[in-house]
């Protein structure tokens, strides 16, 4: 699960742990209130004014305000993996969710301990959910791999795809040997 999807995946795991062989989270929401999060300031490690000034501003706004890596390759990944969801997004529904998008209970309080393979990837320059709050998840996931990628923001898989691909491949390999709880 990515971002809010990370909170939803944790909820599914808490409700049905016997049906889950493992969990991978990229920049998961931990604190539902933005004001309570420990977040980084937005930093662009690889600025590219030639690219960002030449793009339609309505398409590039989120890329510019969230992207740490603003290379042509990162823009292509953003177009392929992020923009389609943004285009299909129901803005009114998102506004309602943003006002209260948390679940009734903290998933980890319901879950307790989960010993399956877990991957948590965060970006050190993530100004949306940060990387510090996710460390509070670790006592609940004793077999977790926790990685904070430098030069990566909220879209760590866009900013540092090779690192994320390697981590996910390792997690998938662990999944092959993980019995269902």
Please identify what each model-predicted range represents:
Residues 10, 14-53:
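Flexible "cap/lid" loop of the alpha/beta hydrolase fold
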Residues 34-39, 132-133, 159-161:
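Short aromatic-enriched loop/helix-cap "lid" or pocket-rim segments at secondary-structure transitions
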Residues 92-139, 148:
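Conserved serine/cysteine hydrolase catalytic core
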Residues 34-39, 54-113:
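Conserved alpha/beta-hydrolase catalytic His-Asp/Glu region
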Residues 89, 129, 159:
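Residue-level signal for the nucleotide or nucleotide-sugar donor/cofactor binding architecture
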Residues 1-3, 123:
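Conserved alpha/beta-hydrolase "nucleophile elbow" surrounding the catalytic nucleophile
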Residues 144-181:
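Catalytic active-site module of serine/aspartate enzymes centered on a nucleophile-bearing elbow/loop
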Residues 3, 7-8, 155:
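Short alpha-helical segment within the catalytic ATP-binding CA
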């Amino acid at each position: 699960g990515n971002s809010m999807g990370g909170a939803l995946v944790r909820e599914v795991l808490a409700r049905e742990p016997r049906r889950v062989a493992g969990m991978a989270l990229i920049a998961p929401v931990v604190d539902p209130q933005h004001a309570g999060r420990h977040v980084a300031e937005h930093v662009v490690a690889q600025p590219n004014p030639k690219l960002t000034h030449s793009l339609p501003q309505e398409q590039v706004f989120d890329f510019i305000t969230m992207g740490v890596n603003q290379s042509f390759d990162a823009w292509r990944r953003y177009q392929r993996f992020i923009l389609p969801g943004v285009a299909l997004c129901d803005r009114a529904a998102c506004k309602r969710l943003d006002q209260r998008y948390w679940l009734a209970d903290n998933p980890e309080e319901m879950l307790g301990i989960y010993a399956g393979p877990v991957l948590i990837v965060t970006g050190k320059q993530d100004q949306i959910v940060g990387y510090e709050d996710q460390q509070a998840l670790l006592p609940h996931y004793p077999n977790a791999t926790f990685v904070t990628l430098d030069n990566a923001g909220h879209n760590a898989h866009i900013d540092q795809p090779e690192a994320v691909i390697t981590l996910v491949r390792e997690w998938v390999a662990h999944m092959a040997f993980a019995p269902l709880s």
